[in-house]
């Protein structure tokens, strides 16, 4: 029920002006009244990520009237976080981001219950995500976005006529920032464009938050970036000269140490080409960009929970390089998307092309890391410490022509840690 406590009523006066009054921007079924604020306070909402964007989101949601919030993040607090992730203090360094952020918000906003989960999003199953009415992502990783996107699509049930059941849809609000640019979008799984529908919007990631590369590296790029921004300044090699990404001796020094760090965390893929590419570009996090995008995401959550206004349709761009500028565009759903539309993807390959060339194409198109390819009768490529028996055959297959591996029309199953579900390709030898 809505609180009758005079102090609580005064605290939410501004929000009640939106929920208790009529509006020209309302959705057609909106009816002014106290029930809207009650619905807001009873909405269960999940925030994924408690970093720069996540801290802003938690603060905004709690101060907007949401009372049941959960936050999930696998990272711990690093000293580099303290300049912009304002829910953390120096004494919190080394502690769980999710747990510290949840405790801070609960202490400052009376009546707001924030539950922390210090784990990977992949550690939670369907029953966990199904209990939420809205999920907001404040992630710095494309694979993580794709995973939760696939999970929410899987939660949508079909009715007898094959159409998605609207009652099983959990809206996803996704926010992202990079330097002075950011975006926010609202996704209705299987109804509007999902993350994979617009995967071309995301270039290969080359900019990484320091907290990630220092504490929980997950990509080869994380290892290289760590050597660049942490190890080089500390060790001051070559008599303390500045790192020159065009100097092959400097690049080799970084490559050797990045390879050792990658080996420590069981990460593959550190090579000279990638090292050179990462060394030449880094964009710092900007607190004001996080604030703007988090505010936009929180506003969309407020609209979804109360129906006081229509959500954006459906992708907001923001930039503050030369003044502040925003625009909203409507992303179209891809009817051939393997995640939200289902089905099998026809994939043309040359009969004389090799399996290695196919893997490169798939990795670039779908942002894969270490894909495994298999037909219904055999594994074509699988490099895994859990299945060493396939390694030699996989290496031999890399240089084998596709016509010698599969027949025209045969299906290949592609799995990868970046995917929440396997891709099914119908090979067309042309």
UniProtKB/Swiss-Prot annotation:
Q: Known EC number(s)?
A: 6.2.1.64
Keyword Transferase listed? The answer is no
Binding of ATP: at which residues? Answer: 52-76
Concerning Gene3D superfamilies, the annotation shows: NAD(P)-binding Rossmann-like Domain, Ubiquitin activating enzymes (Uba3). Chain: B, domain 2, Ubiquitin-like 2 activating enzyme e1b. Chain: B, domain 3
Q: Cite the InterPro entries for this sequence.
A: E2-binding, ThiF/MoeB/HesA, ThiF_NAD_FAD-bd, Ub_act_enz_dom_a_sf, Uba3_N, Ubiquitin-activating_enz, UBQ-activ_enz_E1_Cys_AS
Q: In which pathway does it act?
A: Protein modification; protein neddylation
Q: Name one GO molecular function term.
A: ATP binding
Reactions that this protein is recorded to catalyse: ATP + [NEDD8 protein] + [E1 NEDD8-activating enzyme]-L-cysteine = AMP + diphosphate + [E1 NEDD8-activating enzyme]-S-[NEDD8 protein]-yl-L-cysteine
Which is a GO BP term held by this UniProt record? protein neddylation
User: Does the entry feature the keyword Protein biosynthesis, yes or no?
Assistant: no
Principal location class: nucleus
- Compartments, record wording: Nucleus; Cytoplasm
Expressing tissues: Expressed in intestine, vulva epithelium and head and tail neurons.
What CDD domains does the annotation carry?
A: Uba3_RUB
The phenotype of cells or organisms lacking this gene is:
RNAi-mediated knockdown results in temperature-sensitive embryonic lethality.
What happens after mutating residue 262 to V?
In or198; at 25 degrees Celsius, embryonic lethal due to incomplete cytokinesis with ectopic furrow formation and mis-orientation of mitotic spindle. Reduced cul-3 neddylation
Cite a GO CC annotation.
cytoplasm
Look up the domain of life of the source.
Eukaryota
UniProt record similarity statement:
Belongs to the ubiquitin-activating E1 family. UBA3 subfamily.
Please describe what this protein does: Catalytic subunit of the dimeric rfl-1 (uba-3)-ula-1 E1 enzyme. E1 activates NEDD8 by first adenylating its C-terminal glycine residue with ATP, thereafter linking this residue to the side chain of the catalytic cysteine, yielding a NEDD8-uba-3 thioester and free AMP. E1 finally transfers NEDD8 to the catalytic cysteine of ubc-12. Required for cytokinesis and mitotic spindle orientation during early embryogenesis.
Relate the assembly described in the record: Heterodimer of uba-3 and ula-1. Interacts with NEDD8 and ubc-12.
Record's protein name = NEDD8-activating enzyme E1 catalytic subunit
Species this chain originates from: Caenorhabditis elegans
User: What is the gene name?
Assistant: rfl-1
């Amino acid at each position: 029920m809505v609180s009758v406590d005079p102090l609580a009523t005064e605290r939410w006066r501004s929000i009640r002006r939106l929920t208790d009054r009529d509006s020209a921007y309302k959705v057609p079924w909106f009816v002014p009244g106290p029930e809207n604020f009650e619905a807001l306070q009873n909405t269960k909402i999940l925030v994924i990520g408690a970093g720069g964007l996540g801290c802003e989101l938690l603060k905004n949601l709690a101060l907007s009237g949401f009372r049941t919030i959960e936050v999930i993040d696998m990272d711990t607090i690093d000293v580099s976080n303290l300049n912009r992730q304002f829910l953390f203090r120096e004494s919190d360094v080394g502690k769980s981001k999710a747990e510290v952020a949840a405790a801070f918000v609960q202490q400052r906003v009376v009546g707001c219950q924030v539950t922390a989960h210090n784990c990977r999003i992949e550690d939670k199953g369907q029953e966990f995500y199904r209990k939420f009415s809205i999920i907001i992502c404040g992630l710095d990783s494309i694979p993580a976005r794709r995973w939760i996107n696939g999970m929410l699509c899987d939660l949508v049930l079909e009715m007898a006529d094959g159409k998605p059941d609207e009652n099983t849809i959990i809206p996803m609000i996704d926010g992202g920032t990079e330097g002075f640019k950011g975006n926010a979008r609202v996704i209705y799984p299987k109804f509007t464009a999902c993350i994979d529908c617009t995967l071309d919007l995301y270039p290969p990631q080359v900019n990484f938050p320091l907290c990630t590369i220092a504490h929980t590296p997950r990509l080869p790029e994380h290892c290289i970036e760590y050597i660049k921004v942490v190890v080089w300044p500390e060790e001051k090699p070559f008599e303390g000269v500045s790192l020159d990404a065009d100097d092959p001796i400097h690049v080799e020094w970084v490559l050797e140490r990045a390879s050792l760090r990658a080996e420590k965390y069981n990460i593959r893929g550190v090579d000279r080409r990638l090292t050179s590419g990462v060394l030449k570009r880094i964009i710092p996090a900007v607190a004001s960009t996080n604030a703007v995008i988090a505010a936009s995401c929180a506003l969309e959550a407020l609209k979804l929970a109360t129906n006081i206004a229509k959500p954006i349709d459906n992708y907001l761009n923001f930039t503050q390089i030369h003044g502040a500028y925003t625009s909203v565009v409507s992303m179209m759903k891809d009817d051939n998307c393997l995640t939200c539309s289902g089905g099998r993807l026809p994939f043309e390959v040359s009969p004389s092309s090799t399996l290695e060339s196919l893997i490169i194409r798939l990795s670039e198109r779908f942002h894969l890391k270490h894909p495994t390819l298999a037909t219904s009768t055999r594994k074509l490529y699988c490099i895994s410490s859990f299945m060493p028996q396939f390694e030699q055959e996989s290496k031999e297959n890399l240089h084998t022509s596709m016509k010698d591996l599969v027949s025209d029309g045969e299906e290949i199953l592609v799995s990868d840690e970046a995917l929440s579900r396997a891709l099914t390709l119908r090979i067309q030898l042309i």
